[in-house]
A protein has these predicted regions:
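Extended mixed-charge, aromatic/glycine-enriched low-complexity segments
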Residues: 1-306
Length: 306
């Protein structure tokens, strides 16, 4: 699955910190000198989702046209996070993520299940989620949004591609990167993550009261939660059943391929050839038996073989 990415999962023995958030939606057409939404009573809406890698100082802006949007729910968020880690991730072993405290978008079971799923498949060795405390002001994605909005207020935009141009031109060093949903080279697909992941994981009760979630490959299907950073750890198993065969196959891909190759070789060897090999082994055993062994024993062994 990840062979198309520049950075294969778990190829970098280290950790990276990511943050994500939604910005206020923008409308097109947009003109820098307009007094307000006077003429266009129903302008076209564009949702803006930012995924920031703080180690690189870059943020990808997902521009979602209203015709492509499925809302701002968990399925939309997880789909864009999944796309980002596929195309822009650094292949780190340990991933750390910060996001807003909003339950409908971020702090919910779908986002938590997605982290469990990634660890089970071996895309991360560990994942740590941390949510902002209610009433917080700004964090890393807002800095990138502010730089872009400074550019946005001074330009005209009539199409979605015009919005993408304002994102790319807002930072001289390329810190802001535009990503269209219908990009021909890196298209964004929105999946029904809730339907898929609910087959394998159970909901975490009272999820909204926790602010820290830790998932490790050493304990598959188990999440360690804390209310605050210095609160005691509570371990909860969310796995409904044993991991599906597809998960085991992906995670232990090399072992499975090696094992299947051995099985295929045994199947492809003709039955006559295999019988000949077994007979040769028995004959070697008979010939190399010590002289003190009774000849009748050799005859009995040969008769059993024949």
């Amino acid at each position: 699955m990840y062979l198309l990415s520049d950075n294969i999962p778990c190829s970098f023995d280290g950790s990276f910190h990511y943050s994500w958030d939604y910005a206020q939606q923008v409308h097109i057409p947009h003109y820098s000198q307009e007094v307000g939404p006077v003429y266009f009573k129903t302008p076209r809406k564009c949702n803006v989702f930012g995924m920031c890698c703080e180690g690189s100082g870059k943020q990808v802006f997902y521009l979602v046209d209203e015709s492509d949007s499925i809302g701002k729910g968990a399925d939309s968020v997880v789909s864009m996070v999944h796309h980002y880690l596929y195309w822009y991730g650094h292949g780190e072993i340990d991933g750390k993520f910060h996001f807003d405290n909003a339950a409908g978008q971020n702090k919910n079971n779908i986002v938590l299940w997605y982290g469990l799923w990634r660890v089970l498949l071996g895309y991360h060795r560990s994942i740590e989620y941390s949510t902002m405390i209610a009433g917080h002001t700004k964090f890393e994605p807002d800095w990138h949004f502010g730089i872009w909005k400074n550019r946005w207020r001074r330009v005209n935009a009539e199409t979605l591609h015009d919005i993408a141009d304002t994102v790319d031109q807002s930072s001289k060093k390329g810190h802001n990167i535009a990503q269209l949903v219908n990009d021909g080279s890196k298209p964004v697909t929105f999946y029904q993550w809730r339907t898929f992941l609910s087959q394998y994981f159970k909901p975490l009760k009272n999820i909204t009261k926790y602010h820290h979630f830790f998932i490790s490959a050493e304990a598959p299907g188990i999440v360690n939660v804390k209310i605050l950073s210095d609160s005691p750890v509570v371990s909860v198993s969310l796995l409904k059943m044993s991991p599906p065969r597809e998960i085991i196959k992906y995670r232990y891909n090399d072992f499975v391929i090696e094992l299947m190759n051995k099985v295929d070789c045994c199947i492809l060897i003709p039955v006559v050839l295999r019988c000949f090999i077994f007979c040769a082994i028995y004959i070697i055993i008979l010939v190399t038996l010590p002289e003190k062994v009774n000849c009748s024993m050799k005859e009995d062994m040969f008769n059993q073989l024949s």
